Amino acid sequence: SLYRISETALKNLPSKASAEIRIADEIDTILLDAYPFNTQTDTVDLPAQLKLTEPPDSTLQLIQFVGPIKSEWLQAVEETGVTLVHYIANNAYLIWSDPTSRARLDILPGSHSFMQYSSVYEPYFKSGPSIRTRVLQQKDPSEVVRVTIQIYNHDQVTKSQQIIDNLTLKEIVPWHSILSYQNTTVTVLAGDLATIAQLPD
């Protein structure tokens, strides 16, 4: 069984009960390649160039449950109107939300004990190491960079595709579908990488 208890309650448990308990604080950590963090203890501190100042109308969002995910929890999340995109360890999901569904979703952590974290999926999380370095160092905005871009395939995806196409210097691999995503490989200017990362999908 999985229980959340305070430090005080843990210290006051009988020694026999304490010996049988395994503290599983790793389940609170979302294992993003770019920025693993504990949703209950860590402060997410991201550079301004790769951080949203405010969420777009519709955007990718990151949520985390209190433990191993149950089907009824996913159902409750879907009933807010969001779309489940894919699972992320530990006990987290990437979702697609609009303002209406996001407002409903924001109520869940307070009214349901199964959700403990909900926030926009920041541009920093989407970007590979070499892209982050170029955006943050801003050494040569005119550098031509080869990138593979993956965006969530929603009903307004062509808007983001058009922005990317307008920034493309050379198309290497045309747009194509893989699971829930549209993918392409192109060359762009390093100075345009932040603009692409800031796209909502």
What are these regions (language model features)?
Residues 1-201:
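Autoinhibitory N-terminal propeptides
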